């Protein structure tokens, strides 16, 4: 069983502080954010990370039971590929069905307001779309604490780009990826693997420290 190192716990603490800062916002125009729930994989280091992060979040944020479908794994075969053993192919096929199941469980659009569903288009539709982009107390946020391969795959899937490209992306330990899904179905990636809250000295990826690797 892999658990967090002292550096990993420090990274998780800094991530919790950063999320708390984002949730509070700056003023009425930029925040606060309505975070509903924290979800986490069933792996020990993810559960430790979530525990440390949640110490900084409002008590109103729900904690769900760990979900093994969010556990780390090989989410799909990647392109460009390399020669793989039969066991690796089998693990990838198993990982794909599990991680895809988690993606479909958590990534979906909200129902559109009735006022927009009955709209006949034109300027009112444009105004509604513009209103969606503004800070709004009805916007709901979820935090998912999981793993690099899962995050990269789900980002590709959410953006509707080939998921086989997942290995071309890089998400550092305790980085933040921020996706928005509108009721209209539009999806935007506002942050991918952001580590500004960690600083160079505490930035790591898969055993590598810093950026010169």
Q: Where do the language-model regions lie?
A:
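GST superfamily/GST-like fold recognition
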Residues: 148-152, 188
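Generic beta-sheet signal
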Residues: 36, 138-149
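Active-site-proximal alpha-helix that buttresses catalytic centers in soluble enzyme cores
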Residues: 1-66, 89, 173
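Phosphate-handling substructures
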Residues: 1-3, 51-137
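Acidic, low-complexity terminal tails and accessory targeting/binding regions
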Residues: 21, 55, 59, 70-88, ...
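Catalytic metal-binding/acid-base residues of hydrolase active sites
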Residues: 44, 70-71, 149
